[in-house]
Each structure stands twice: as C-alpha cells, then as structure tokens.
C-alpha cells in the first residue's frame, strides 16, 4: 500500500516526508515530497494528490513539483506574516478536526502564541460538547493566550479552563472569553 515515513515538520514552512508504494511514469515508487503548508495532516492530502498524479501518468518530478507549489485557498491554513506577527488563518467552515489541526500547527510556532477562536456552526446536537472538547485539546498545547468570541466559543474557553484546572502540568494558557464580539475587537484592535 501507499504510506509515508521520514515525516519531518518544517514548522510553519510545511512538512517533508518520503512516500512509498505508488508507481510513477518514470518508474519511481519511493521519493521525497515537501508540502509547503504546515501541519502533519497535510501529509495525507499530499499523498492522495501524489496517488492521483501517478494514476494520471505523471512522473515523480512532476508530482514533486505539483506538491511543492501547493497554494491554499482563502481561510484554509493560510500563513500571513505582517508587522512582526504571524497569523494562521483557518477560519473557513471550521469544524473540530480542522480546529484541532490548526492548534497543532500553532503549537509548533516559535514565540508567543495567541489563539483567537470563534464558534463553529452546523455541528448538530452535540455542538456544545464539541466546542468544549476543542478547549480541552487546546489545554494540552503550548499556547499562551486564548481569546474566544461567541456563545458556542465560550465552551472552548470553558474546556481550556477545565483542563488547566485539573492538570498540574498544563502550560497555563491565559483565557479571555468575549461576548459580544465587539468587546473582543476593542481588546485586540
């Protein structure tokens, strides 16, 4: 089967890995790839793209070039560097899995780390618990400040506080929960 090993985080610059088990037009079944988008989860996306490329008859060099030139869409894992700040914009149609993946990416960043999170919508009847679980997950990360805005996002703040209160080795994230959103904008603006 197709698998990856030698997975190395390049921080906010992406991830490199070796892919095995696909047959390219130049007869390579093992080669190195670098995904220029951060997050371990992006390895799976790159592997799927490489597999599709091999089925379409691409060479390992063409697959490598395609993966290396990956561009994200607005609101999906965009890294914005401006005025000495680095922003990870992953707000489009957020869900618990994507939010946790973004927190993993933020956890790898160097310097002071601030997560600004809003409510996730269309999650169904367990939406409050899902937000709370994201907060508990955030509590396991090396994140300095959490700022939330929105009714459901308050559950993220509650989950983070609960994790910190019950785990003596928790990082100690500073938690701020705002409602309405305008109060938050005044705080960070």
Spell out what each predicted region is:
Residues 23-28, 38-41, 47-189:
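ATP-dependent carboxylate-amine ligase
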Residues 1-30, 73-74:
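Extended acidic/charged loop-beta regions that coordinate divalent cations
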Residues 33-36:
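Beta-strand/loop nucleic-acid-binding surfaces
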